[in-house]
Structures are given as structure tokens and as C-alpha cells.
């Protein structure tokens, strides 16, 4: 075996061993020590992160991609399923990022969840999720990818409903699993199509044998799968609802890792899509619609976690736009940079929520810059990185995406929506900074504001460093596969920056407008549209069940009771009997001449018929 291949495969084996060891220790009959989460889980993930740097450095030095097939799961005359791992640009970069972010979040969770009696089980769930995510990222066949896909889905369900004593948490968990199940149907049907028509689930073989085939049908299934998992328009309501889970869950699953699985699926299978204009156009338009709609919803939300959740959905829409542009590597770059600052935004939110006695309404915060300077500074850095401030992590990916959009020959509709959404991103990010950090405190003086704990500050600082330098590090070391347009007019080059600055100016104007009321009864149509999430939950979650109930009631009362038991049954029998009675009673009226005439005619007719 080639030394590079040996290093890559043994590193992955070492990572899995380190992550699975704490899970094995839980199988013993004796209960775990109360510090098990810190001594076993956090240490294992820290060590796994350090091990994952080895294949990264080898890849940077050698630039070789490797596929390792270890074991045959199923071997028939026509179909093979192997246990195979793919070490390429995507899996080698994403694995250390996932481990680094998880390490920071778990350290934060040790403080956030310290009073929870089942904290060890919580950490075990997070560890299981991480293993499923790494299986998904490194899989080289669809079956293995599907195992990771379902693994992250079920862990999401368990972690959203962690506080299952609350009805909202149970509802949100059920909602997440149902929406994801719709997406899973698309993935399962696509896999069935690939197995039937391409006779393989190995990704390399699928690429080779799909040349010349019309792949529109399976690609639509894959896009449906990505729509469900990555909260694209139509299947997006589960992501803001998922904020019912603990903040570390939101930071890990619903910002940086699990929600990008749908986008990652499309990136991994992008060679199937690159020549299919239907699939690319669907991705482009769906992503543009998602990024604008969810950014619009974020503008007027008051729950700090909901704002960050909608911003996640908006950034996922931007990644989908990039896939529609035929630029999967840019989408992956945005996944990597987005993971750092979005996880950090959630951790800062969690720290502030905990400090204010579980208060999540930004209108009841304020003045946090003086009370929690480190957390507020990191919140500001994260928000600025999200808006695409030059030289922070988000700038390197967002700017490249908008430049690619500007210089492409695709429809201007998607470009306009994306630029609007980028402007809105600046508005809601500055709104969070304005309400949370600036001004005077708007909460009770008894709030236990305290950030002087290494378990709070260290993870946020680590992610802050990632939010500052990750974009530069990744773009410096990995050359793009598609050469971008190197020369363009100044106004195109500055487009992303200009819409961001205009967004910041609009945000300042809106902030001043919120303190004034020009009319006694102001018209709030646009505000209500944004605040009520475009009336989407009201229509889908209320109107659809109401229509079904009305239909059921109509069938039960109108069709069965009214029609069958009343009209067809008793009344119809009565009408039929009446007709027969009326007919026979009309004959018996004592008209002798008529009877004799009829008798004579009928007799004559009978005789004539007999003679002839």
C-alpha cells in the first residue's frame, strides 16, 4: 500500500477508535462518573482533532486523493455493496473542521448543561452524532452515506426533544423528523433509480456509467433530499422550530454540521449534475428563493436563536445558489467558513441567554458590551463575519460566490434575490448587535451575568480565531478547480461590499425608526409578513389540516349520513313505494267504458298476432 494511503486510512481508523471508545465504556453495568463527559468525551474529540490534522497536512503536501475499500457488505452476481472510504479535498478538510467545532461546543456544553441530571447521556448523543457525520462525509458509496444521513437525522430528533417535558420541544422534534422524512423519500427513490439503472452505489462507478443517460429524475430526488435536510424553501419550517433544543445542539447540529449534509450530498454527487441544466436551474432558483425568504423572516424576529437559525437557512440557500452556478467548491468553502462563525454566534447567544435567566428576547437585553465584554466582542465578530466584512472568514466565501454570480450568464432573477438577501443579512446582523450589545440594560438587576468561566470563554475564543483566519487559511492552501474570472469591472468587484454597506445603512435607519411612531394605527403588512414567517406555517400547518378535517367531516356527515342513511335509504324507498302505489291506484277508478275499450283493443291485437 502507498504510504500516503496508509497514513490516510490509519488516521481515519484512529479517529473512529478514539470516538467509539467512550461509547464502549458506557456499556459497562456500573454507572459513569459524573465527570465522564469531560474526561472521556471531550478528551477523545480533542485527540481525534489532533489526529485528523495529520491527513490534512499530508494532503496539503502530496495532493493525492485516495479511496480505500476494506470490506464487502454484500456480494451478489449483479450488485456489490462495499465498505469504502473516500479521502479527497472535501472529506479531508471537513473532518478536522467538524472535530474542532465539536470540541469547542462540547467544552461549552459542559458549562451550559452542568445542572442537567442526564448530562452524560447528552454527551453520548452528541458523540454518536459526530460519528454519523464523519461516516457521511467520508463515505464513498450511497449505502454508507445513507447510514450517516439517517444517523444524523435520528440524533437531531433526540437532541431537539431533549427537554421532553415541554410540549414545544416534542412538537419541534416531531416536525424536524417529518420534514426530513419527506427529503429522505427523495434520497431513497434516487438510490433505487441508481441501483436499477446504473447497477452500482459506488460513487466513482456511478460517475463512469451515467455518461449519456438522462439523470433528471434521480437528480430531482437528490435535490428533494437536500431541500429537506438543508432547510430549503418549502421544507424550511423545521429549522427555526429546532431552536427548542439546548443551545449546544443548535450550535453543532443546526448551524455547522448536520444542516449542511444536504448541500454536501449535492457537492459529492456534483459530476452527475454539471451537465443537467434542469437540475442546476432548480438548485439556483430554489437557493435564491430560500436565501431571500429566510433573510426576510429574520428581519423582524425578536428571539435571538430564531434570528441565527433563519440566518443559517439563508446561508444554506446561498450554498444552493452556488451549486446551481456549477461551483461546488465555492459552496464547500462557504460551508467551512460558515461553520466557525455560526457555531460561535450560537455559543455567544447561549452564554447571554444563560446570564439573563433564560431570556431570549433581544428587546429585553441591551448593554451587554459592558457586562460581558468577551462574549459581546465575539458576537460582533461573528455577526460581521456573517455579513461578509472584508478579511474575516465569511468574506472569502461570500465575495467569491457573488463574484461568480455576477460574472455568470445565468438569470438575473437569482442574482437580484441573492444581492437583496446579502443586504438583509447585514440588516439583521447589525440589529442583533444593536439590541444585545449597545444601549442600556433592559433586564432586571438580579440577572446572574457572568462569563468568567474558562468553559465559556475558551470555546468562544477558539471559534473567534476560526471566524477571523479560517477563510484566509483555506483559500491560501486550496486552489479552486474552476478558474474564476480574474478581471471584471470595478462595480462588479465591489457589488457584494456595496450591498452589505447599504444593508448596514438601512439597519441604522430602521433602528432610529423603531423609536418613532408616525401614525396612531400604523399599517404593518410587511412587518407581519416577516414576523409571521411569510404566513407559511399558518397556511401549511393550519390550513392544510383544516381542509383535511373539513373533507373528513363532509364525507362523514354529508356523504354517509345525509346521502346514504337519509336520501338513498328511507326517503328513496318511500318515493319508490309512492310511485308504485300512485300508478296502481290510478287504474282502479271505476271507468267501465275505458276498461272495456282497453280489453277489446288488447284482445283484437292478440288475435291478429296469433293469426299472422
From Swiss-Prot:
Top-level taxonomic group: Eukaryota
Function text: Core subunit of the mitochondrial membrane respiratory chain NADH dehydrogenase (Complex I) that is believed to belong to the minimal assembly required for catalysis. Complex I functions in the transfer of electrons from NADH to the respiratory chain. The immediate electron acceptor for the enzyme is believed to be ubiquinone.
One Gene Ontology cellular component annotation held by this UniProt entry: mitochondrial inner membrane
One Pfam family hit: NADH5_C
Recorded topology in the membrane: Multi-pass membrane protein
Source organism of the structure: Oncorhynchus mykiss
GO molecular function terms listed in the Swiss-Prot or TrEMBL record: NADH dehydrogenase (ubiquinone) activity
Protein name: NADH-ubiquinone oxidoreductase chain 5
Transmembrane segments: 4-24, 48-68, 92-112, 127-147, 176-196, 215-235, 247-267, 279-299, 307-327, 330-350, 376-396, 410-430, 463-483, 494-514, 591-611
Subcellular location: Mitochondrion inner membrane
An individual GO BP term: ATP synthesis coupled electron transport
Annotated keywords: Electron transport, Membrane, Mitochondrion, Mitochondrion inner membrane, NAD, Respiratory chain, Translocase, Transmembrane, Transmembrane helix, Transport, Ubiquinone
Catalytic activity: a ubiquinone + NADH + 5 H(+)(in) = a ubiquinol + NAD(+) + 4 H(+)(out)
EC number of the protein: 7.1.1.2
Top-tier EC class: translocase
Family: Belongs to the complex I subunit 5 family.
Amino acid at each position: 500500500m502507498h504510504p500516503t494511503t496508509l497514513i490516510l486510512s490509519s488516521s481515519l481508523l484512529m479517529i473512529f477508535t478514539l470516538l467509539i471508545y467512550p461509547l464502549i465504556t458506557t456499556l459497562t453495568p456500573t454507572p459513569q462518573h459524573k465527570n465522564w463527559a469531560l474526561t472521556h468525551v471531550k478528551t477523545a474529540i480533542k485527540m481525534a482533532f489532533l489526529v485528523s490534522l495529520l491527513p490534512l497536512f499530508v494532503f496539503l503536501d502530496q495532493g493525492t486523493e485516495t479511496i480505500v475499500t476494506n470490506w464487502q457488505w454484500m456480494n451478489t452476481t449483479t450488485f456489490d455493496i462495499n465498505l469504502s472510504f473516500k479521502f479527497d479535498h472535501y472529506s479531508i478538510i471537513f473532518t478536522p473542521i467538524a472535530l474542532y467545532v465539536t470540541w469547542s461546543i462540547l467544552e461549552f456544553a459542559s458549562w451550559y448543561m452542568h445542572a442537567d441530571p442526564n448530562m452524560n447521556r447528552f454527551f453520548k448523543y452528541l458523540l454518536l452524532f459526530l460519528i454519523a457525520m464523519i461516516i457521511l462525509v467520508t463515505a464513498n458509496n450511497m449505502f454508507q452515506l445513507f447510514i450517516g444521513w439517517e444517523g444524523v437525522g435520528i440524533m437531531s430528533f433526540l437532541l431537539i426533544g431533549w427537554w421532553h417535558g415541554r410540549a414545544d420541544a416534542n412538537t419541534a422534534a416531531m416536525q424536524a423528523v417529518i420534514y426530513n422524512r419527506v427529503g429522505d423519500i427523495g434520497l431513497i427513490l434516487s438510490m433505487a433509480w441508481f441501483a436499477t439503472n446504473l447497477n452500482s452505489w459506488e460513487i466513482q462507478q456511478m460517475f463512469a456509467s451515467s455518461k449519456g443517460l438522462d439523470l433528471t429524475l434521480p437528480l430531482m430526488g437528490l435535490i428533494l433530499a437536500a431541500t429537506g435536510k438543508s432547510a430549503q424553501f418549502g421544507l424550511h419550517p423545521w429549522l427555526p422550530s429546532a431552536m427548542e433544543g439546548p443551545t449546544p445542539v443548535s450550535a453543532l447540529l443546526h448551524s455547522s454540521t448536520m444542516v449542511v449534509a444536504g448541500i454536501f450530498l449535492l457537492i459529492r454527487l456534483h459530476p452527475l449534475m454539471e451537465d443537467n441544466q434542469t437540475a442546476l436551474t432548480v438548485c439556483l432558483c430554489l437557493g435564491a428563493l430560500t436565501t431571500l425568504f429566510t433573510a426576510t423572516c429574520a428581519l423582524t424576529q425578536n428571539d435571538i436563536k430564531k434570528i441565527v437559525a433563519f440566518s443559517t437557512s439563508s446561508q444554506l440557500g446561498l450554498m444552493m445558489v452556488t451549486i446551481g452556478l456549477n461551483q461546488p467548491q465555492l459552496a464547500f468553502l462557504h460551508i467551512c467558513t460558515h461553520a466557525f462563525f455560526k457555531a460561535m454566534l450560537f455559543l455567544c447567544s447561549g452564554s447571554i441567554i444563560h446570564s439573563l435567566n433564560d431570556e431570549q428576547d433581544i428587546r429585553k437585553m441591551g448593554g451587554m458590551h459592558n457586562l460581558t465584554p468577551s462574549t459581546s466582542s465575539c458576537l460582533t465578530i461573528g455577526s460581521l463575519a456573517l455579513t461578509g466584512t472584508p478579511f474575516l472568514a465569511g468574506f472569502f466565501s461570500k465575495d467569491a460566490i457573488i463574484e461568480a454570480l455576477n460574472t455568470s450568464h445565468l438569470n438575473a432573477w437569482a442574482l437580484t434575490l441573492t444581492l437583496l438577501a446579502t443586504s438583509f443579512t447585514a440588516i439583521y446582523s447589525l440589529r442583533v448587535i444593536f439590541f444585545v450589545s449597545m444601549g442600556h440594560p433592559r433586564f432586571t438587576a438580579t440577572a446572574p451575568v457572568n462569563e468568567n468561566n474558562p468553559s465559556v470563554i475558551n470555546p468562544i475564543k477558539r471559534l473567534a480565531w476560526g471566524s477571523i483566519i479560517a477563510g484566509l487559511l483555506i483559500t491560501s492552501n486550496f486552489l479552486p478547480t474552476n478558474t474564476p474570472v480574474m478581471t471584471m469591472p470595478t462595480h462588479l468587484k465591489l457589488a457584494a461590499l456595496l450591498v452589505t454597506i447599504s444593508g448596514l445603512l438601512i439597519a441604522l435607519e430602521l433602528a432610529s425608526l423603531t423609536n418613532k411612531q408616525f401614525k396612531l394605527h400604523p399599517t404593518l403588512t410587511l412587518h407581519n409578513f416577516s414576523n409571521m414567517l411569510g404566513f407559511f406555517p399558518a397556511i401549511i400547518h393550519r390550513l392544510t389540516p383544516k381542509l383535511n378535517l373539513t373533507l373528513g367531516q363532509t364525507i362523514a356527515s354529508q356523504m354517509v349520513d345525509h346521502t346514504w342513511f337519509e336520501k338513498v335509504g328511507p326517503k328513496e324507498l318511500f318515493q319508490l313505494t309512492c310511485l308504485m302505489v300512485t300508478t296502481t291506484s290510478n287504474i282502479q277508478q271505476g271507468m267501465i267504458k275505458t276498461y272495456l275499450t282497453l280489453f277489446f283493443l288488447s284482445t283484437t291485437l292478440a288475435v291478429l298476432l296469433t293469426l299472422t
